[in-house]
């Protein structure tokens, strides 16, 4: 029965990605890039400045300039800094997609898939800017913090409550269940290969740790993410840079191979090019989530003086994820010279690193994937919880959701790799399609906000937004 379900998943996934999602993703990314006049390139210095040098004002100001999320713990207001707000989103982006996803893309689509991952990041970061700016615009005031996301701009921006509920359900299924099953599956495969640990045993450990973290609340999520993500990213980047430097003479040929394969110059069969493009964009979206509607859930929780500030921050996250971390995985695999068709997923990354640094490569990747994937499980959980609260803000609903997430972590540990990925591909496609429709319809508002931000910067001001600037929708902008 499992095989039959898996076959259905594969067929549905192939149809969605071959005939619908790829075209829609690319068209929307190009459209947003044009409408914003290449915001992801023009304002990259501003993105870095906002992250590293947030403006300081009084914490009781709604329009304060420090990018932060406010959380009440034990009766006291706690601040989650701009850096923590950034890494909560980055924790979800940086995960299995960076190690196993890249390897799968290369194994199935060839080295050229890496090129299409880069293209999705370069153009798709404009989509990330639009969706996160809109999430900020339509965010709501909670008792102790702001909250929001695509479900909210669908309801209050488009006036379509049903669409918001549909998106919320898809978000819960995709991130709370499907993505977390992939993360769990990859961790267990890596640890089985490195240490011989049974996946079921590892699944139990993962499930218990997940319950411990998610019942601690967003403050614990932010603390965990802000500690783990930078450490794991730096270590992995250092190893990758070391591997590339050690094989520096191979790098020009690797880059040439990526470009040649991206356009089918060396392909033996005409259909291979299509597979290359699909794999690159599919795994690129799984990794950086640009336009998918996930990062806006974290972006909406930030307290900023202008919605564009958080839009720029999240666009930077797409660059960081794909152009830096994913590229590191790709270079490790391609400079190693291992047969990319001999293995798949995380095991290909393990084989490549073992080839470069010796037998320590296997356990190193296993530990690294634990950190990457487990931080993603926590980030994914938070996105799902936001949407559970959108449908019905009840303690019982959240409690049931937490148990369901833990159950999917356990299930993901024991199902096949193909089953986990196929399930995720379908829900990811539907979620992305729903979100892209909404942000295309609302893109005019995000462009207006960008123009307002740029104008204030030209006047030497620290940009501040007020809903009086958009009187036609002012009654829907609760937080401004």
List where the protein language model places each region.
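N-terminal alpha-helical transmembrane segments of multi-pass membrane transport
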Residues: 1-89, 96, 107-112, 441-480
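Transmembrane helix-loop junctions in multi-pass membrane proteins
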Residues: 4-5, 35-40, 97-102, 176-187, ...
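Extracellular loop-to-transmembrane helix junctions
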Residues: 13-53, 105-144, 320-326, 362, ...
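Transmembrane alpha-helical segments of multi-pass small-molecule transport proteins
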Residues: 22-27, 164-172, 193-218, 235, ...
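Membrane-interface loop-to-helix entry segments
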Residues: 24-31, 36-48, 185-191, 198-247, ...
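Helix-loop-helix module between adjacent transmembrane segments
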Residues: 32, 120-144, 150-151, 155-185, ...
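Alpha-helical membrane segments and immediately flanking helix-loop junctions
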Residues: 61-106, 134-137, 143-151, 155, ...
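Extracellular/periplasmic helix-exit of transmembrane alpha-helices
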Residues: 129-139, 143, 239-257, 265, ...
């Amino acid at each position: 029965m499992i095989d039959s379900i898996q076959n259905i998943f594969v067929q549905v996934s192939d149809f969605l990605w071959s005939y619908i999602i790829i075209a829609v993703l690319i068209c929307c990314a190009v459209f947003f890039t044009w409408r914003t006049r290449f915001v992801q390139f023009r304002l990259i210095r501003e993105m870095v400045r906002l992250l590293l040098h947030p403006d300081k004002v009084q914490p009781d100001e709604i329009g304060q300039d420090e990018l932060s999320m406010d959380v009440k713990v034990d009766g006291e207001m706690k601040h989650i800094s701009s850096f923590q707000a950034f890494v909560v989103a980055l924790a979800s982006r940086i995960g299995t997609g960076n190690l196993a996803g890249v390897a799968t893309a290369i194994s199935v689509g060839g080295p050229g898939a890496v090129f299409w991952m880069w293209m999705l990041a370069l153009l798709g970061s404009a989509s990330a800017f639009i969706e996160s700016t809109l999430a900020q615009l339509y965010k709501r005031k909670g008792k102790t913090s702001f909250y929001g996301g695509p479900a909210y701009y669908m309801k209050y921006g488009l006036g379509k409550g049903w669409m918001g509920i549909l998106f919320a359900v898809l978000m819960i299924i995709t991130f709370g269940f499907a993505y977390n099953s992939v993360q769990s599956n990859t961790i267990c495969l890596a640890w089985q290969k490195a240490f011989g640990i049974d996946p079921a045993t590892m699944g139990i450990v993962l499930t218990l740790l997940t319950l411990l973290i998610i019942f601690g609340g967003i403050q614990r999520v932010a603390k965990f993410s802000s500690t783990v993500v930078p450490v794991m990213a730096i270590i992995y980047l250092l190893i990758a840079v070391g591997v590339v430097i050690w094989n520096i003479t191979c790098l020009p040929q690797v880059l040439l191979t990526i470009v040649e394969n991206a356009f089918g110059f060396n392909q033996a069969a005409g259909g291979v090019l299509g597979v290359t493009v699909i794999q690159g964009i599919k795994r690129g979206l799984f990794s950086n989530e640009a336009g998918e509607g996930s990062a806006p859930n974290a972006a909406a929780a930030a307290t900023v003086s202008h919605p564009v500030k958080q839009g720029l921050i999240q666009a930077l996250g797409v660059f960081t994820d794909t152009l830096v971390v994913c590229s590191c995985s790709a270079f490790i695999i391609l400079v190693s010279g291992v047969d990319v068709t001999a293995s798949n997923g995380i095991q290909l990354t393990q084989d490549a690193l073992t080839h470069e640094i010796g037998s320590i490569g296997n356990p190193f990747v296993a530990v690294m994937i634990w950190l990457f994937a487990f931080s993603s499980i926590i980030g994914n959980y938070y996105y799902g919880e936001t949407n559970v609260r959108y449908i019905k803000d009840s303690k019982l609903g959240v409690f049931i959701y937490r148990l369901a997430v833990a159950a999917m972590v356990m299930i993901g540990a024991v199902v096949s790799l193909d089953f986990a990925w196929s399930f995720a591909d379908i829900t990811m496609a539907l979620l992305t399609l729903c979100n892209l429709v909404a942000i295309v319809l609302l893109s005019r508002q995000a462009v207006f906000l960008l123009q307002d931000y740029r104008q204030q910067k030209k006047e030497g001001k620290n940009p501040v937004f007020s809903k009086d600037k958009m009187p036609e929708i002012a009654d829907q902008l609760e937080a401004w």
